[in-house]
Amino acid sequence: MKILHVCSELYPLLKTGGLADVLGALPQAQNQIGLDARVLLPAYPAIIAGIQNTQVVAEFDNFAGHVVLRYGEYNGVGIYLIDAPHLYGREGNPYHDAYYNDYGDNYKRFALLGWVGAELATGLDSWWRAEVVHAHDWHAGLCAAYLFNKGRPAKSVFTIHNLAYQGQFSYHHLYEIGLPTGMFHVEGLELFGQISYLKSGLFYSDASTAVSPTYAEEITTPEFAYGLQGLLSGLKAQGRLVGILNGVDENIWHPNVDQYIPHHYKLKYMAGKKKNKAELQAYFNLPQDESALAFVMVTRLTEQKGVDLLIESADEIVKQGGQLMILGSGAPHFEQGIRELAERYPQNIAVKIGYDEALSHLMVAGGDVILVPSRFEPCGLTQLYGLQYGTLPLVRKTGGLADTVVDSTSESIKARTATGFVFESATPEALRHCLQRAFALWQKPRAWAMVRTDAMEQDFSWRKAAEQYRTLYERL
């Protein structure tokens, strides 16, 4: 079965979030189970730099101007690149300029992505024709609309990685992107008087997926649906919306092969974890104390990620003699808030503003608890990395966090199902209470070791996700 993934990021060449990690791993896992998966994405400078040996598949002019379609390979996966420098030849973030202003021609840049995705199902490459076009997030949302407009030559799947980003543009652009005005309708592309690329993906695809079963439920409610609850609950009722959990790329995120950490370890040989903890404490200039419970947080500093909850309850970690290390960047007031914590408690709390891939790996490997107190979290990858590395996730019960972490209670520890710590309400008090429970378990080294073992034995491999997607494709 020939699968075309249509997306706008690919790890490690270009990444702004978890979407890139998924596309860096899922197609490869699908090929390993016998599917024929390829990827289509814009030829951004970072992508061209990483995929240099390409051949021209097609050259044409359309609503977006002059376009060359190239084909190459990366990590054993076939990659199509849309080479249109007037649209994609911009360094840095693929969606906005250095001042965080969205590019004014995004409607055209991502319409072209969807258009080429549909054309690859109708013979644009005479040697390979997609049977399933699998589009990811709003950037690729128009794929399904173009396929619909061509009489549905292939099956279509749309994956929601984050419903908060919808890709809404003025309806005046409709005639510029080659779609008939009849599709601008509440039973079509229209949302709140604008074209919604995200809604297009949901409405016109044969099936949609969310990146966890709980998130697939949550987005049918007004709180999480951003005005799309009617459409989403309808899809759910028809069996056209399902949740499939993301996996972990074990070539990159596994404590026994991780190229970024100084000391490898595995379930049967954990000595390296203690050594990584000492290295991490040294990096952050915190006391190298093996007995101090070390909390780590690697995150965007936003309200979605629950950073404010942590700022208000972090003194609990200090009070109990623990340590807290944070890596991330984001809203200036949150950056300031965590800097102030580190200044107030220099023996217990340390912060690095920014992003550092190598440090993020050391934090996951060297920490004892990884904090993910998100208000909402479609899937979440950091808690999965924590499980893999025996760094117990402390999470809020939402989205993929609810699907992947089992709270440590006396019953669940005894039943060997506990894998971390879970709190329900998005309040500093609830987080504080959960921190207290983590300290209580830390005082029982044998119980802690049991939970850590059970966490590390969880299977969140991409192979598992690849099998679930195959089952979905086969029933379309």
Swiss-Prot record:
Pathway: Glycan biosynthesis; glycogen biosynthesis
GO biological process annotation, one example: glycogen biosynthetic process
Domain of life: Bacteria
Keywords: Glycogen biosynthesis, Glycosyltransferase, Transferase
Catalytic reactions of this protein: [(1->4)-alpha-D-glucosyl](n) + ADP-alpha-D-glucose = [(1->4)-alpha-D-glucosyl](n+1) + ADP + H(+)
Keyword field contains DNA-binding: no
Gene Ontology terms for molecular function: alpha-1,4-glucan glucosyltransferase (ADP-glucose donor) activity; alpha-1,4-glucan glucosyltransferase (UDP-glucose donor) activity
SUPFAM superfamilies: UDP-Glycosyltransferase/glycogen phosphorylase
GO cellular component, one term: cytosol
EC number(s) given by UniProt: 2.4.1.21
TM ranges: none
Keyword RNA-binding attributed: no
Protein residues bound to ADP-alpha-D-glucose: K15
Family: Belongs to the glycosyltransferase 1 family. Bacterial/plant glycogen synthase subfamily.
NCBIfam families membership: glgA (TIGR02095), PRK00654.1-2 (NF001899)
PANTHER family named in the record: ALPHA AMYLASE DOMAIN-CONTAINING PROTEIN, GRANULE-BOUND STARCH SYNTHASE 1, CHLOROPLASTIC/AMYLOPLASTIC
Role description: Synthesizes alpha-1,4-glucan chains using ADP-glucose.
Name assigned to this protein: Glycogen synthase
Organism: Haemophilus influenzae (strain 86-028NP)
